[in-house]
Amino acid sequence: TLMRSSAASDVYKRQIVNYYVHSSNHVRSWYLSGDVSQNIDALNGQAGLNVGYNLSGTELLLEEVPASYENSTLTVAPRFNFRFAAWVNTEYRLEYRYTTLSIRGREPDGRHDFNQRLTVNLVPSKKWVIQFTAEHYYSQLSADRSKHLLLADASLRWKINGKWEATATAANLFGREKYAYTTFDGVSSGSYRYAIRPRNILLGASWKF
């Protein structure tokens, strides 16, 4: 892709000043991904893996000096779904990302981040269904700083009879209400803020006719 402007960045009094300069600039990018899954009869389940790689590059001006840079992201996402017993079903998913920023004349800067989710369903009898869900988020901010977030939910369903059913759900058991962090890679900075619904308990009943 041929663009008619180049990004530029200057450091002025410890502030990053971004602007555009009228010039020709080439932007290149490509993406590769693959997915595979396999049934595992011994565990009455399935395992899968998705892998993706994205690479993009262009040129920018750092303090009025042209510099080429590349940004790459490797994504690895395994998943598992097993039934260890007739009354236990477990699902686990992980998405891991490694992002690298490479600028000519500088050491590459790499960051890790991932999120994972575990869901366990218990069916001790035909009348009861219990579910637990846990989520973990991790973001690397710098070489020695990182951010974590852990969430958990639980639910219970009781089939009273052929028509009546009662449910109870407890969401955000740890009471986390926000998740915020800022990243800086020497070229740009980004601030991320997520609002989380406060801890709550919901009770319900339904009737089939």
Q: Each predicted region: which residue ranges?
A:
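C-terminal beta-barrel architecture of Gram-negative outer-membrane proteins
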Residues: 90-159
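Residues that define the transmembrane beta-barrel architecture of outer-membrane proteins
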Residues: 26-32, 68-74, 108-114, 148-152, ...
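C-terminal beta-signal and adjacent terminal beta-strands/loops
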Residues: 138, 158-209
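Residues on the lipid-exposed face of transmembrane beta-strands in outer-membrane beta-barrel proteins
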Residues: 32-38, 76-84, 116-122, 154-158, ...
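Repeated loop/turn-to-beta-strand initiation elements of outer-membrane beta-barrel proteins
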Residues: 40-47, 86-91, 126-132, 162-168, ...
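Membrane-embedded beta-strand positions of outer-membrane beta-barrel proteins
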Residues: 6, 47-51, 78, 90-94, ...
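Single conserved hydrophobic/aromatic residue that forms the stacking wall/gate
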Residues: 1-8, 12
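Transmembrane beta-strands of outer-membrane beta-barrel pores
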Residues: 9, 51-59, 94-102, 134-140, ...
